[in-house]
Amino acid sequence: MDTQEEALNQAHTPAPAPTTGPAPTPVLAPALASAATAESRAAYFMREALKEAHAAALAGEVPIGAVVVYGEDIIARAHNRRETDADPAAHAEFLAIEEAAHKLGRWRLTGCQVFVTLEPCLMCAGLMLNARVDACSFGAWDPKAGALGSVYDLSCDPRLNHAFDVIPGILADECGDELTCFFRARRQRARE
């Protein structure tokens, strides 16, 4: 074989794949990428609400936390303070919505989404309706008093003058575990 023929054969032979270096980054289709982004966004904000729930537990309150998001920013955060404030309305969602309204300087919270670790009760779901929030994402279902799908569903009642989106089950296990651990510890202390 002459050198010209050898050169042509080598030019058409693929180079061996490199054996070292980082693996190629998978490219997601735009729809999958946006779904992954939406999922990580929701998880991020729910983790912030979980931080509030943990603060509530440390204060001896039922561990429920909430954040209000406007655009991509958390503008309000709160946790249950019923025992601390001796106030039956001091639910995490209620306090966070009040704070958001004060920060925005308006009672209509259009453009806002509430993230809360437990499905809201009737009072808090009613406040979300009155505040005109765009959406509520919650972690654990509340089969005893939930008002966004478990027992009641105020979010889409046709008799009401507003409706909002509900995204349930965000980090549901983590949110449920926070409550389970709190009440287990409370029962244990009561037995001692």
Regions found by a protein language model. Name each.
Residues 75-82:
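Short beta->alpha transition motifs characteristic of CBS
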